[in-house]
Amino acid sequence: AAVQPLSVSDAMGARVDAQAWRVDRLTKQFQAISDAADTSIGAAKSGGDIARHMLNSHLDDHWCPSKYHRCGNSPQCMSNMAFCDGVNDCKNHFDEDENRCVVPVTANSTWIGYPAYDHCTQRRPYEMVISITSAPSDIVYKVHQPLKVQVDLFSKKGGLKQSASLHGDAVYCKGSQRLIVAPPEDDRLEIIGQFDGVSNDRFKGYIVREMSGDKCAEFRFFKQ
């Protein structure tokens, strides 16, 4: 049978379909490039924030006296006790910044920690769980947030799994951004959780000898 030539309307329709396909393909390519750019920009911003924080932390260690912190990017140092007390002590008001004064260890929050090293605990736990059982919500302009905590320890002995549950008092210091758990046992080992000022969902937990202040174990905690 003879091939019938395309009508004008059919030819126009085919051309429109081809153009639509090309436009759709270009749109998808552009979106992919745009998404990749957004990801790169986001990573760069995040990396920049972390780099700035690391630099500031390094400067804090060498710039300000013990129990003092820099007022953000300012060279001014301020006592830990002046942070988040409702009074602007830093010239740039960094000490009362709403992000700086967040208390990440809220009531009913749970934090699971895994050992980086352990040279001193009795049980040598492979997992430690800190649960915040109570945190007063009416304390706004207080440098120290009092807490009640439960510490669950999971360990192994002779191939058998063991667990222990301890209860005690703790405090979150807004100035130093530290969670301090008083020694829950007679060995007088306290837990000091140090937040980095960037991520509120994790912290380094140090086991510290109460009398000397020496760190003898470290756990990495993550919010659940």
From Swiss-Prot:
<dbReference type="InterPro" id="IPR036153">
    <property type="entry name" value="Eryth_link_C_sf"/>
</dbReference>
<feature type="glycosylation site" description="N-linked (GlcNAc...) asparagine">
    <location>
        <position position="108"/>
    </location>
</feature>
<dbReference type="InterPro" id="IPR002172">
    <property type="entry name" value="LDrepeatLR_classA_rpt"/>
</dbReference>
<keyword id="KW-0813">Transport</keyword>
<feature type="disulfide bond">
    <location>
        <begin position="64"/>
        <end position="77"/>
    </location>
</feature>
<comment type="subunit">
    <text>Giant hemoglobin is composed of four heme-containing chains (AI to AIV), and two linker chains (AV and AVI).</text>
</comment>
<keyword id="KW-0561">Oxygen transport</keyword>
<feature type="disulfide bond">
    <location>
        <begin position="71"/>
        <end position="90"/>
    </location>
</feature>
<keyword id="KW-0325">Glycoprotein</keyword>
<keyword id="KW-1015">Disulfide bond</keyword>
<dbReference type="InterPro" id="IPR031639">
    <property type="entry name" value="Eryth_link_C"/>
</dbReference>
<dbReference type="InterPro" id="IPR023415">
    <property type="entry name" value="LDLR_class-A_CS"/>
</dbReference>
<feature type="domain" description="LDL-receptor class A">
    <location>
        <begin position="62"/>
        <end position="103"/>
    </location>
</feature>
<protein>
    <recommendedName>
        <fullName>Giant hemoglobin linker AV-1 chain</fullName>
    </recommendedName>
</protein>
<comment type="function">
    <text>Acts as a linker for the assembly of heme-containing chains in the construction of giant hemoglobin.</text>
</comment>
<dbReference type="InterPro" id="IPR036055">
    <property type="entry name" value="LDL_receptor-like_sf"/>
</dbReference>
<dbReference type="GO" id="GO:0005344">
    <property type="term" value="F:oxygen carrier activity"/>
</dbReference>
<feature type="disulfide bond">
    <location>
        <begin position="84"/>
        <end position="101"/>
    </location>
</feature>
<dbReference type="Pfam" id="PF16915">
    <property type="entry name" value="Eryth_link_C"/>
</dbReference>
